Every structure is written in C-alpha cells, then in structure tokens.
Amino acid sequence: MAAYAARYAPVPKQAGLKFSPEADVRFDIVERVAGSASTDFGVPGVVPALDLEPLQKREAERMATLVEACWTMFDRVVAGAPAELRKGPRGGGRDRDKIVDHVVGAEATAYAPRIGLRLSQPAFDDTKAITAHRAAIAEALRTGAHGKRTPEDRGWPARYAARRIGWHAIDHAWEMQDRSNPE
C-alpha cells in the first residue's frame, strides 16, 4: 500500500481530505482474513469482521465522499484516454469504452444490489443515467438506507461496499492510464 501512496493521492485530494504520500507511513494490522483467488488480482473480495461494526454518520459521509472522488478520477481518466488502448502482452485487454461499460455495469447490476438498490445498467455513454446511479449508491452509503446488510444475506456492509466500489473504479482508471501510453 505504501508503494502506491502517490498513485492513490489524487483520490483524497479530490475528496478534500488531508493525505501526504511522502509521509512515513506505519500500518497497524487490525485483522487478518483469508484471501481467495480474486485476492491474487487485488480484489478486496472478503468482508472483514471489522466492517460489520456500526458506522457513525461522519465516517459514512467520509466514505461516500471518497467513493465519489474515485468516480471523479475514473471519469477524468476516461476523458483523457484514447478509445483504443494498448493491448497486453498476449494481445488482450478491453478498450476504453468496454472498460467503462464494465465498470458502470458492475456498479448497477453487481454492487448496487449488495447494498439494497435495484438499478438497471445504463449505456456506457449515458452520463445522465450514470450520474443518477452513482448518486443513489452514494446516498445509500451515506444514510445506511441499505440497512444492516451482511455477507450471510449476500449483502455488503457499508464499509466493505465503499472500499469495493471505490477500488473497482480506481483499478480500472489505473488500467486505462497504464495502457494509454505506448510501451
């Protein structure tokens, strides 16, 4: 995580939060969870017990603001990325519009239901619908409108949902950045 601090820095800056990527960072391990095959690819795929603890209003607001900052960063990268991205070493990889379609599709059809929302997938270029979907997701994270969702009912608690949704947008923003430049 510390090695990626500079890459994460635009997110808290966008959210209006203090963050110094140059500071000496010390991590305290507060919980260990078993990973899955997804973990090898960086997916935060396991809900830690700590995420099930009650969420205070101030923390919910902070998390929702960080998720919105992730979306803003994603949208900026999309706006600056070429339609056709450099292919991977085996010639694979989605181009920009397919990545956008994947991200907004996951938010609407995979992530939103996990926090109690029913959203249909918007077209990748329907900015009005995407904005409305994201506003609904952020509102659910802020207000706890999704209730006390747990892994047992296939739901996600707010902390995990915010981390997963934000990670997904940032991960694909970085993919587009990395593949926008010639090797």
Features from the language model and the residues they span:
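Transmembrane alpha-helical segments of integral membrane proteins
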Residues: 139-148
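Short hydrophobic/aromatic-rich motifs at helix boundaries and adjacent loops
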Residues: 43-48, 81-83, 111, 144
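A short small-residue
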Residues: 50-54, 118, 151
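A short, mixed-charge helix-start or loop-turn motif at secondary-structure junctions
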Residues: 56-60, 154-155
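Short, charged, surface-exposed hinge/linker loops at domain edges
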Residues: 6-57
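Short, contiguous alpha-helical
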Residues: 1-18, 64, 68, 72-131, ...
